[in-house]
Amino acid sequence: MLRFIQKFSQASSKILKYSFPVGLRTSRTDILSLKMSLQQNFSPCPRPWLSSSFPAYMSKTQCYHTSPCSFKKQQKQALLARPSSTITYLTDSPKPALCVTLAGLIPFVAPPLVMLMTKTYIPILAFTQMAYGASFLSFLGGIRWGFALPEGSPAKPDYLNLASSAAPLFFSWFAFLISERLSEAIVTVIMGMGVAFHLELFLLPHYPNWFKALRIVVTLLATFSFIITLVVKSSFPEKGHKRPGQV
């Protein structure tokens, strides 16, 4: 650095020596002399003393990337890589969980499908569907307990997690109590599934994303199947055996 300053001061002193009054009467020889002086002291090519004095700095600066930062592009790529909704994580579900979930939807979908095909309302099938839905609510409450109990789980075994897991159980119990009025019992099961869905996805968001996607699919299909059963009951004639305990 000192050598660079010394060289620059020498060049400045040489320029001062060649300070000519450039004007209209300046001779061509004087202008050429000034031009040669500037070329000798400020050559566009790199000087050997400069490259020998700073070999490390030259090599380091040549490896640097000098293009401007593009934070907007990086943010846009991150936003594009992120899925738009929770349902997109359904493909990330483990195969056993996906197969068991699809098999578990059969008791929800089969009764209204049979009644639609026969165009009759069969009480025993409707009761079977309602009983399965109420049992499924108890299963959802047990999932929360099982998720909160292991050590190191993101869901701690506190009052919020454990007490909220009992909410679906109460809807299930009440649905069996009023099973004599099957339509009201089905509506109770639908309400319980909605409450469980709200607790798991919004108030207690500790489950994996693929499990949330499965819960969305199960809740929508189960609710839709229950609604079809209620429509069939009000639209088609009743036929078949009465449910157990019904006169």
UniProtKB/Swiss-Prot annotation:
Entries under InterPro entries matching the protein: DUF3429
TM annotation in the entry: 97-117, 122-142, 159-179, 185-205, 216-236
GO cellular component, one term: mitochondrion
Locations listed in the record: Membrane
Keyword Transport on entry: no
Keywords tagged on the record: Membrane, Transmembrane, Transmembrane helix
Presence of keyword Transmembrane helix: yes
One Pfam family it belongs to: DUF3429
Disulfide bonds: none
Superkingdom of source: Eukaryota
Membrane topology classification: Multi-pass membrane protein
Protein's recorded name: Transmembrane protein 69
Organism: Homo sapiens
